[in-house]
């Protein structure tokens, strides 16, 4: 698993002085980017190849929100590539205490060909550099959301895009 250590900054906290959800997700995304950069397949590589990974699905389980100033370790690992998809886990723990979990996540990414504007197959050149690891132990949810049989409940409408 690729990891980096950090300290929760004031600018990353919510009104209670704890790491915000947005910042927790930012740590996960940064971890992936740091790994890609360290492996030589970072932003410049992606620009040259006209490719981009796009997040398709997140499943994040948060056990706690660390407080400002706490030291944390953020980790990520790929656990599979199939067709256009990349499966990736994330783990955030208290620094030096790998058994003290803060959050764990499952994610699914789609590799996009930016010239064609559509998904592309993950080639060995792209996938092999990350290696394949065992999925982290967690309850994996389906990425498909079931519609309730009773049709759910009607809520206020809101404009998504004009």
Q: Locations of the language-model features?
A:
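Hydrophobic beta-sheet segments that form the core/acyl-binding groove
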Residues: 59-96
């Amino acid at each position: 698993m690729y990891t980096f250590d950090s300290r929760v900054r004031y600018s990353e906290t919510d009104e209670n002085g704890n790491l915000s959800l947005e910042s927790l997700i930012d740590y996960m995304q940064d971890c992936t980017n740091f790994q890609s950069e360290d492996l030589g397949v970072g932003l410049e590589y992606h620009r040259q190849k006209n490719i981009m990974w796009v997040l398709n699905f997140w499943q994040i389980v948060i056990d706690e929100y660390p407080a400002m100033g706490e030291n944390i370790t953020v980790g990520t690992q790929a656990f599979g590539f199939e067709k256009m998809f990349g499966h990736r886990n994330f783990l955030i723990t208290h620094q030096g205490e790998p058994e003290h979990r803060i959050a764990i996540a499952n994610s699914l990414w789609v590799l996009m060909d930016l010239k064609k504007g559509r998904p592309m197959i993950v080639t060995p050149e792209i996938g092999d550099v990350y290696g394949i690891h065992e999925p982290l132990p967690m309850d994996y949810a389906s990425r498909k959301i079931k519609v309730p049989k009773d049709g759910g409940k009607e809520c206020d409408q809101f404009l998504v895009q004009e």
